[in-house]
Swiss-Prot record:
Pathway: Cell wall biogenesis; peptidoglycan biosynthesis. It comes from Bacillus anthracis (strain CDC 684 / NRRL 3495). NCBIfam families: murD. Keywords: ATP-binding, Cell cycle, Cell division, Cell shape, Cell wall biogenesis/degradation, Cytoplasm, Ligase, Nucleotide-binding, Peptidoglycan synthesis. Belongs to the MurCDEF family. Gene3D superfamilies: Mur ligase, C-terminal domain, Mur-like, catalytic domain, NAD(P)-binding Rossmann-like Domain. Cell wall formation. Catalyzes the addition of glutamate to the nucleotide precursor UDP-N-acetylmuramoyl-L-alanine (UMA). The lineage of its organism: Bacteria, Bacillati, Bacillota, Bacilli, Bacillales. GO terms for biological process: cell division; cell wall organization; peptidoglycan biosynthetic process; regulation of cell shape. This is UDP-N-acetylmuramoylalanine--D-glutamate ligase. ATP binds at residues 119-125. Coiled coil: none annotated. SUPFAM superfamilies: MurCD N-terminal domain, MurD-like peptide ligases, catalytic domain, MurD-like peptide ligases, peptide-binding domain. Disulfide bonds: none annotated.
Amino acid sequence: MKTVTEFQNKNILVLGIAKSGYAAATLLQKLGANVIVNDGKPLAENVLAAELQAKGMDVVCGGHPLELLERNISLVVKNPGIPYSNPILVAAKEKQIPIVTEVELAYRISEAPFVGITGSNGKTTTTMLTFEMLKEGQKHPVIAGNIGTVACEVAQDAKENEVVVTELSSFQLMGVELFQPKIAAFLNLFEAHLDYHGTKKEYGLAKANIFKNQTENDYSVINADDADVMALSAYSKGQKVLFSTTKEIEDGACIKDNALYFKAEKVVEVDDIVLPGQHNLENILAAMSIAKLLGVSKEAITAVLKRFTGVKHRLEYVTTINNRKFYNDSKATNMLATEKALSAFTQPTVLLAGGLDRGNEFDDLIPYFKNVKAIVTFGQTAPKLVRAAEKAGLDTIESVDTLDEAVVKAYAHSTDGDVILLSPACASWDQFKTFEERGDIFIQAVHKLI
């Protein structure tokens, strides 16, 4: 960890506890700050808050009182999920108090360089692929951010010869000031999180913060097939490395003659890649680009791609029952993810979909229903998905109350050789705490069929 003195004796407000807030507060105390921790949940229900209080921190729970800002606050470290429209953040901004997220702290103390990966879809798969490729290439990666350990915990122990690989959301990237990844990858962009950002434009600009502090000594890995990403890459001063699944890229990564190439070097045959789905070729090209920029050999990259089968809850193969294959794609929290999942299969498919209603319709899914023989919907968006399925002319459409019921109905509507796919196209928070919980319940329900 770097020697950092900028926080000594400063009053710093950590807003929202959870894992990242707990780690940030603990780190700041270690760096000599006077830490004030604030969380909306009452103290009696907040184990982490009680632990921080036991460490001698000033802990205020049960709301976000504006009076906290009268304590000569030098910095606010916010939980990514707390919107900037929250009154305490509005007031902090008016007082010109800097507001950052935990990943900014991690960067400031880290001896190791960062690789940052963002995009609407594919972040976790690309992050894991990058980590595995760097590990195979003996580049000493450590993984942090939305997957793995909280970034500022990882950064405390990261050495100069290591690489911190981070998956970054728009929420996290809105709160960066100095964060400067050696390599920044922007995978794709489409309309999402409008309840937080308001417009697609603002969402894209938040993502583009990944380029904010890059210089000509850094690299920006860009999806050349995504017009929005290409436009936002104008914010990067780094060396741009493009990747594409649709056209040849002479100075980047592409697919040619059924093989993946990087800067004219043939790296791996497509047929040697075990990870399913056309969309995953984009993720692979991005990860391969990062690995090659950091000096990983094509042999190491190929070795990973011959064994990497995917990430849990992301088009995850579950089991086969009576020649029906079950796939868990619970991470598909938006339409684009479900479109890509449906495009991955040519077999007749029974789709399970539904979840939190964020106000959108689902007509964009209709062109991807060509192999869908039946749909079972659940959750708040069930009626909207039914309308889209009716417009698509599906013969078998059913709505149920629970995911357990949906699995039973989906199996009943399937026949020999079918795929049964959970790809909800919605967030999980109407019925589940997380998409992981939703995926785990799906897997449990599938195993009950055996």
